[in-house]
Swiss-Prot record:
Dihydroxyacetone phosphate binds at G180, G209, G210, S211, N230, I231, N232, T233. It catalyses: beta-D-fructose 1,6-bisphosphate = D-glyceraldehyde 3-phosphate + dihydroxyacetone phosphate. Zn(2+) 2 binds at D107, E137. InterPro entries: Aldolase_TIM, Class_II_FBP_aldolase, FBA_II, Fruc_bis_ald_class-2. Catalyzes the aldol condensation of dihydroxyacetone phosphate (DHAP or glycerone-phosphate) with glyceraldehyde 3-phosphate (G3P) to form fructose 1,6-bisphosphate (FBP) in gluconeogenesis and the reverse reaction in glycolysis. This is Fructose-bisphosphate aldolase. It comes from Ureaplasma parvum serovar 3 (strain ATCC 700970). GO terms for molecular function: fructose-bisphosphate aldolase activity; zinc ion binding. Homodimer. It comes from the Bacteria.
Length: 290
């Protein structure tokens, strides 16, 4: 029996009690270990997310599932853990479900709202049978590519409402947030839009691009219906800085005998874990497991 849980209960509980579940994008074994340790130490709910790119890098959906499940068992993790596909295509969602993922995000935001809803309906017929939770995106999230930062779309309120007439578990919508590092001239989240969407849909809302948003804006977003916040960039930076710092201090790796990759990567694991615990604290999700 799989130790994974779907996200429905943990996200709904967060929504009703004004905290947010951290969704940690995992990139390799070290990321999984760090996130599981952070959740166990703080008694916090945890959502592990893989992008389709990370799935390819880590050897496929079956391998990602096996790594997460086996580490949960080997590390004797008792806190609830959900394995989630982030920004999945229709085909990717099917593959993730078949591999044993307990949650999916279908990203049809680049399609017309009619086609997005149609594909979501089809996926829901499968997820209901499998007990898999569903996140759907309306209004694409911005990001930085080739040095050019896109602010992303501001989601259409009526489109959000139409999507939430379906039995989805959480809604991702563009409210001025972007993936990656926020530029200095970023305008911030559009709280008026977030408030209107929350009042209209009455569903847990997902904030993508959570890395780099101020604590004040995070808390305000949570109070306006955000119940899941995605984190990736800050963990990547923490991991890279920790390894760079350690290797710089080590100097000659042969003379200092600092060439064992397991020992080197342990510094990165600690850095990721500490970053995640900091997010749990700021999202008010500490000790939320009864």
């Amino acid at each position: 029996m799989s130790p994974l849980v779907n996200a429905k209960k943990m996200i709904q509980n967060a929504y009703e009690n004004h905290y947010a579940v951290a969704a940690i994008n995992i990139n390799n074994l070290e990321w999984i270990k760090a996130a599981l340790l952070a959740a166990q130490e703080t008694n916090s709910p945890l959502l592990l997310a893989t992008s389709e790119g990370a799935v390819k890098y880590m050897g496929g959906y079956d391998n990602c599932y096996a790594m997460v499940v086996n580490l949960i068992k080997q590390m004797n993790i008792k806190t609830p853990v959900c394995l989630h596909l982030d920004h999945g295509t229709y085909e990717g969602c099917i593959k993730a479900i078949n591999a044993g993922y307990s949650s999916i995000m279908y990203d049809g935001s680049k399609l017309s709202i009619e086609e997005n809803i149609k594909n979501t309906k089809e996926l829901l017929t499968i997820t209901k049978l499998k007990g898999v939770s569903v996140e759907v995106e309306v209004g694409s999230i911005g990001g930085t590519e080739d040095g050019i930062t896109s602010e992303g779309e501001l989601a259409n309120i009526d489109d959000c409402y139409q999507m939430c007439l379906l039995d989805i578990d959480m809604l991702a919508c563009g409210i001025g947030n972007i993936h990656g590092i926020y530029p200095k001239n970023w305008k911030g989240l559009n709280f008026n839009l977030l408030k209107e969407i929350n009042n209209k849909v009455n569903k847990p809302i997902v904030l993508h691009g959570g890395s780099g948003i101020s604590d004040e804006q995070i808390l305000k977003a949570i109070n306006l219906g955000v119940a899941k916040i995605n984190i990736n960039t800050e963990c990547q930076i923490a991991f890279s800085n920790a390894l760079q710092d350690h290797l710089t201090k080590a100097g000659d790796l042969i003379l200092s005998k600092q060439y064992d990759p397991r020992k080197i990567l342990a510094y990165g694991v600690d850095a990721i874990k500490n970053t995640i615990i900091d997010k749990f604290t700021k999202f008010n999700s500490l000790n939320k497991i009864k």
